[in-house]
């Protein structure tokens, strides 16, 4: 890969820092109140946000332009087959990025889904950081 200019390098670090913060918030909230539907929804939101930001960090590093989107499937497609193939469950998080935040549109987070969301977001993190470490 081509070296990044300082601005893109800073953006890459920002994406990762923000994703790390989202994942940490999700973990803490799940530990505090996974028995509460609204808390589970917030956990799902932060997991979706974390996965989205990790993927945007990867796309930034690969110098692949991406639209303003919360669509994990689209971001995976832009990242390419090896990444998309290694994270088949990641697109499950997409509805938790927007729809879950508004009344009437929510994809329901069932008990246990918060753990699944955290696991998927963690898998995205691990995959992205492994790729970035090779560069």
Region locations from a protein language model:
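Terminal alpha-helical segments
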Residues: 1-135
